[in-house]
Each structure stands twice: as C-alpha cells, then as structure tokens.
Amino acid sequence: MSNVQTSAEREIVDLSHLAFDCGMLGRLKTVSWTPVIAGDSFELDAVGALRLSPLRRGLAIDSKVDFFTFYIPHRHVYGDQWIQFMRDGVNAQPLPSVTCNRYPDHAGYVGTIVPANNRIPKFLHQSYLNIYNNYFRAPWMPERTEANPSNLNEDDARYRFRCCHLKNIWSAPLPPETKLAEEMGIESNSIDIMGLQAAYAQLHTEQERTYFMQRYRDVISSFGGSTSYDADNRPLLVMHTDFWASGYDVDGTDQSSLGQFSGRVQQTFKHSVPRFFVPEHGVMMTLALIRFPPISPLEHHYLAGKSQLTYTDLAGDPALIGNLPPREISYRDLFRDGRSGIKIKVAESIWYRTHPDYVNFKYHDLHGFPFLDDAPGTSTGDNLQEAILVRHQDYDACFQSQQLLQWNKQARYNVSVYRHMPTVRDSIMTS
C-alpha cells in the first residue's frame, strides 16, 4: 500500500506581514496582495498609521482616505489558458509574465519590487487594470489596456494610476455624449399620439442607459435582477473602509523657528475583511487612495457668474427642473480663470443641489495650502478627462519635503488563511 500523501487537513496558515509604503495624492496604490487557492478562507485585519509628509503651513483641511480589498480569480486574467493550465496539471505550459522597466520601483503600483529579470506575473498587472477600469475610472473614459508595465508612462508606473477628484459639480458631470435635445419626425398636419408615447418610452430607456447603466450589471439591476462578478469578469469588492485623516499644528520652539508652525497629519487606521471563502485560485488585493477635497480660491457659485439671471436660473420651479433637458455649461461659468473650452453637461438646477467651497483670495497669494492654484485643466488644454483626474503636482507646494512622496504608511497586515496544505514537516519528509 502506498504511503504517498495525496491530501491534507484544512489548517490555519499565518500570512501576516509588515508593509512600509508611500505614494502620491490621488493615485491608486496597491498596499498588499496575497495569492489564494481554491477552497481557502481568507481573513484580514490591517492596523497601522498613515502620515502625510511634513506640511509647509498649518493643517487646513483633512484628507479623505479609502482602503479597498478585491478578489480577482486568475481565470479572469488568463481566460481559457488558465482552464487548460489546471487541466494539464504538471504538464501544463507555464503562464506568461509581463515586462517591467529596469528601475526597482516601476512595479510599485502593484505593490512589489521589480525582480532582477525585470518581469512580474501577468495576474498582478492585469488584476490592477481590471480593478481600475471597473471601479476607478469614469465609465465614459477609455479603458487602460497596457499589455506590459513597460508600456506605462513613468509617473503611472512609479506612483500608480490617477483617479478622479472627490465628487462636486465640475468633477462628476454627465457623460460627454449626453443629448441636450431629441427630435421626432411627424407627418404634415398630423401627430401620431401613439407614436409619440413610443418615442417617449424609447428616449427614457436610452437616457437610463446613458446616465446610469453604462455597465452590464447596472442594466440587469434595473430589471430587478443581479449578476455575478463572473458575468463581466469584474473584480469582486470584498471590503471598503473610508475615513478622514486629521492631524495637528506644531509650533516652533527653538530660536530659529520661534513663532512658526506647520501641520502634521498622523492617523491610525484599521481595515478588516471578515472570513471570505475563495471559490477558485486568484489574488486578494488591498489598495489605498488618498485625496484632498478639490478646493480652489478662484471657484464661485454658478449663479454668481451669470450676468443676467433668468427665471429658469433662479426660480427653482419644480415643473421646469423635472422636465428640462440637461444644461451645458463651461468651466468659465464656475471658475474665474476656467477654460471656456471645457464643456460639461449637468442636470438642470444642479446649483441648487450643491454648493462650492469658499476661500478668501488672500490664500491664492500664498503657497503651501492644499488648494488648487488654478482652475482644473488650465495647464492641460480643453481636456475634460485631464481636468477631473487628480494631478499630484497641484499639491507639491503643500509639503516641506517629499522624501517619502506625499503620504507614507506603516502597517501590519494580519492575514489568516484556512487552507488544505501539508505541514512543513510533511513537505520535508517526502513519502
């Protein structure tokens, strides 16, 4: 009778690890990843401290911090190649890798150092792309499809991908293809009432898909159903934690700095994932995103920029608000120095649903506060996508130094996995 071991009891495996990381504001950073096996039960309890680099001036506003944990099956990355790989077993063809640049930090966006061969597993790169495309880009933006990390520009490879500003009137507009009018042809001297109702119904379903259903799962949800994350190869969001990072002002006490003060931000955090059953081989990825609220001393209320106020602008008439089509405005209508060429489409009377922040213009004359010096998009031309994505360069003047970039984090990721795996002793004592 053979004594070859062919199975193992399900035991707990401690995969806890420390992570010392840093990044740029507004860029999506992988802070931890764990490969998992079919049948695993995964638990995560992350604790640590997040710091901003030393601020040049006193602490003015808190920053918004988001942590996300996703599960991505390898099948979503490799497709049929993965299925054949598992069928063939030890005789399977090796899975491909992707090419990185030769610099050690050019795979930082997926939370690893570039190995000596300048290649990393494809599942790390493609899983990050899938997460970004499904959750962190506006649906009307083009997908990121770079085949290799070496195809990324230097900032994206080192500092990760740019994300949108926190939502407000100018950073979350309607899709650019939004229609402002809809026409229906009719026969002379007559109106087809039934055809008119049908046209209304068709317009309604088109608008629903344009504004709220640009992804398959949203369409199915509108029918009262739901889709598995497998339906569109979507990474599964397992847990999301968000909080505001606050701090304190430090007064200078020595002779050279007496009377001066600067801001310090240190925020402890906890991000926990309850026990999650892993249905098939894949990777658990935890990502962080830190952003300041987008505030500009040159922003003003939409009504303040209107030289002639109409009834529709000011009255807030429910009959008009509920029936008028979206309105097209420009950044010039919202910022003193806004570009008139950046057009956005917004719901009618959106200025009665939101209100801009106000900053005294004296702040504009001072450097070092976490405010946008210019209207978004001023330096990038009439490009709406560039305007609503965070530029970390806009916040460079806030920090005394960026030796650890704009934020840094020290954390312990307490990871426990219940897994069918022989003990180390069994692996050493072959047969």
UniProtKB/Swiss-Prot annotation:
It is found in: Virion. One of its GO terms (biological process) is symbiont entry into host cell. Signal peptide: none annotated. InterPro entries: Capsid/spike_ssDNA_virus, Microviridae_protein_F, Microviridae_protein_F_sf. SUPFAM superfamilies: ssDNA viruses (SSF88645). Its main location: virion. Keywords: Capsid protein, T=1 icosahedral capsid protein, Viral genome ejection through host cell envelope, Viral penetration into host cytoplasm, Virion, Virus entry into host cell. GO terms for molecular function: structural molecule activity. Pfam families: Phage_F. GO terms for cellular component: T=1 icosahedral viral capsid. Assembles to form an icosahedral capsid with a T=1 symmetry, about 30 nm in diameter, and consisting of 60 capsid proteins F. Upon virus binding to host cell, one of the spikes dissociates from the capsid and the virus interacts with LPS through the exposed EF loops on the F proteins. After the genome had been ejected, the channel formed by the F proteins at the unique fivefold axis remains open. Pentamerizes and interacts with H protein, G and B pentamers to form 12S pre-assembly complex. By binding with protein D, induces joining of twelve 12S complex to form the procapsid. The procapsid has an external scaffold made of 240 copies of protein D, 60 copies of the internally located B protein, and contains 60 copies of each of the viral structural proteins F and G. Upon genome packaging, interacts with protein J. The mature virion is composed of 60 copies each of the F, G, and J proteins, and 12 copies of the H protein. Belongs to the microviridae F protein family. This is Capsid protein F. It comes from Escherichia phage alpha3 (Bacteriophage alpha-3).
